[in-house]
Amino acid sequence: MNGLVDSSRDKKMKNPRFSFRTKSDADILDDGYRWRKYGQKSVKNSLYPRSYYRCTQHMCNVKKQVQRLSKETSIVETTYEGIHNHPCEELMQTLTPLLHQLQFLSKFT
């Protein structure tokens, strides 16, 4: 052993991040998932605070940040960190009746 430590094993895998900007009067946009706000802070050189959210689904570690732009107040920037490990609840509520109907119709073919 030469005394050097391999830190590559100790590094935590970073979650994928992506952000987008949306023109909206509402600060919180409905994306189909349920979120719990866990923080808010003032950001240097910004008129608007940044809000922090976590997905409420058990064992899902996705987070998002939401902030209105100071220079373009009609724009909200949303940044997601991570990938959901469960289906979108709103999508499932929409699809469930359709899937039951298709299952019913398949009995006749």
Swiss-Prot record:
The keyword Nucleus applies. Residues 24-89 bind DNA. Keywords: DNA-binding, Nucleus, Transcription, Transcription regulation. It is found in: Nucleus. One of its GO terms (cellular component) is nucleus. It comes from the Eukaryota. GO terms for molecular function: DNA-binding transcription factor activity; sequence-specific DNA binding. Belongs to the WRKY group II-c family. Transcription factor. Interacts specifically with the W box (5'-(T)TGAC[CT]-3'), a frequently occurring elicitor-responsive cis-acting element. This is Probable WRKY transcription factor 43. It comes from Arabidopsis thaliana.
